[in-house]
A protein has these predicted regions:
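Bacterial N-terminal signal peptides
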Residues: 7-16
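N-terminal, post-signal-peptide region of Sec/Tat-exported proteins
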Residues: 49-86
């Protein structure tokens, strides 16, 4: 009998301005894996030309915990598809260091806003960041102690017992409530009804909640309706924020990159704007993890920025099919009998774990004060029976479809990655 494994990742983010000078040193194993999978999922897991936002960090955190229990060909396939390094010890260490860096950032006290950041210069609210991981496992199931010890030590993910056999629906409600609490009510009903059954054995969850104000707010009085050109060329009027100041900037082959920093300077919004109104598809073909890493340290220049306000709340993503199409088939027991998570729990031909689905849900809103975003991902496991620097001030009008990311500057990690085709 195969037992389902569910991995949930949730992330919420609230942000609000920053800059491209030099590329990062070689990105860490975790940062590279996060960004590379994000690029893959944006291209393969979402419909071209539509609004979308993913949390590559959230997705990878849950899958990295799952990977800690994989063995044999299942592990080999996951290594390739998830862009992991062969040195697994170093990989988990890298994810642990990234989690610590994010948690440390979220634990900093209230900062005094720079002049002009808040009217009157009063203290601004600090960046609020919570990163939480948890395992929800079947009560009494024989999970291997080394696996449990690794994910708790490295990912801060304790095991919470749930009796899926007696009442899978009650377990689903409990997990969704935990997700909702961690994401400040931005992510609700992550795991849909009937997704968990009496065969469910483990749900792996990552949650990130981030609320960060801009380093300098956009003046509310400057916001006005301006035309935004949709992918078919039609203009629509949308509320557009405007601000002039030092921001990161680079003019590259066919597009511009602008970074707008958040308070504290450890996070920024990256905007990748095609030069032409119909250039989004060509830009997405150029998108690579190396490009994202290079954009993490931009050159400061004087920018006149016009940026639309927007709010995105796509439905739950089911990522299993996309991960299969990328080559990660054995983890989903395809072909039957191939799933091998023996390092997570003892495997026999008639009783073993497999991934049944990976659920992911996001939320993001951007306005004059900052950005709020949330995401959640769940991996369910089931039991089975068999750059160029400008020299003059630059006007950047974000008035047609573009790509965006919320980046952790020092590592280049994309906490969120998406596209905006229609801000309405």
């Amino acid at each position: 009998m195969k037992l389902p494994l569910t991995s949930l990742l949730m992330a919420t983010l609230s942000l609000g301005a920053m800059p491209i000078s030099r590329a990062l040193e070689k990105p860490s194993a975790a940062a590279h894996a996060v960004n590379a999978l994000g690029v893959d999922l944006l291209a393969r897991g979402t419909a071209a030309g539509t609004n979308t936002v993913l949390s590559p960090y959230s997705i990878q955190s849950a899958l990295a915990m799952t990977y800690a229990g994989a063995a044999g060909d299942t592990r080999s396939q996951m290594t390739g598809v998830l862009h992991y390094s062969e040195d697994e010890t170093a990989l988990h260490q890298s994810f642990g260091e990234l989690r610590t860096a994010l948690e440390t950032m979220g634990a900093k006290p209230v900062e005094q806003a720079p002049a002009g950041a808040k009217k009157g210069g009063e203290p601004a609210q600090p960046v609020q960041l919570t990163v939480a991981n948890r395992l929800f496992g079947q009560q009494g199931y024989e999970f291997r102690p080394p696996f449990l010890e690794l994910v708790e030590r490295t990912y801060g993910a304790p095991l919470q017992s749930i009796d899926f056999i007696a009442n899978a629906e009650a377990g689903r409600v409990k997990i969704n409530n935990w997700v909702e609490e961690q994401t400040k009510q931005r992510i609700t009903d992550l795991i849909p009804g009937n997704a968990l059954t009496s065969d469910s054995r483990l749900v792996l969850v990552n949650a990130i909640h981030l609320k960060a104000p801009w380093a300098r707010e956009f003046p509310t009085r400057a916001t006005q309706p301006l035309p935004f050109h949709l992918k078919n060329g039609d203009p629509v009027e949308v509320d557009t924020m405007q601000r002039t100041g030092k921001m990161g900037y680079a003019k590259l082959d066919g597009f511009q990159a602008v970074t707008v920093p958040y308070l504290g300077g450890e996070l920024h919004l990256l905007v990748l704007l095609p030069e032409t109104r119909d250039g989004l598809a060509a830009l997405e073909k150029k998108l690579t993890p190396e490009l994202l890493a290079a954009c993490a340290s931009p050159t400061l220049t004087e920018i006149e920025l016009s940026l639309p306000k927007f709010k995105l709340e796509p439905p739950v993503f089911k990522l299993a099919e996309t991960l299969r199409s990328l080559g990660m088939t054995h983890a989903f027991d395809d072909p039957k009998g191939s799933a091998n998570f023996d390092r997570m729990a003892p495997r026999t031909p008639k009783d073993y774990l497999m991934i049944s689905e990976v659920f992911h849900k996001t939320y993001m809103a951007l306005d004059e004060k900052g950005t709020e975003a949330a995401a959640a991902t769940a991996v369910t496991m089931t039991r089975s029976t068999s750059l160029i620097e400008p020299t003059t001030p630059v006007a950047v009008r974000v008035d047609h479809p573009f790509l965006f990311a919320i980046q952790h500057r020092s590592s280049g990690t994309c906490l969120f990655l998406g596209r905006l085709c229609d801000p309405r």
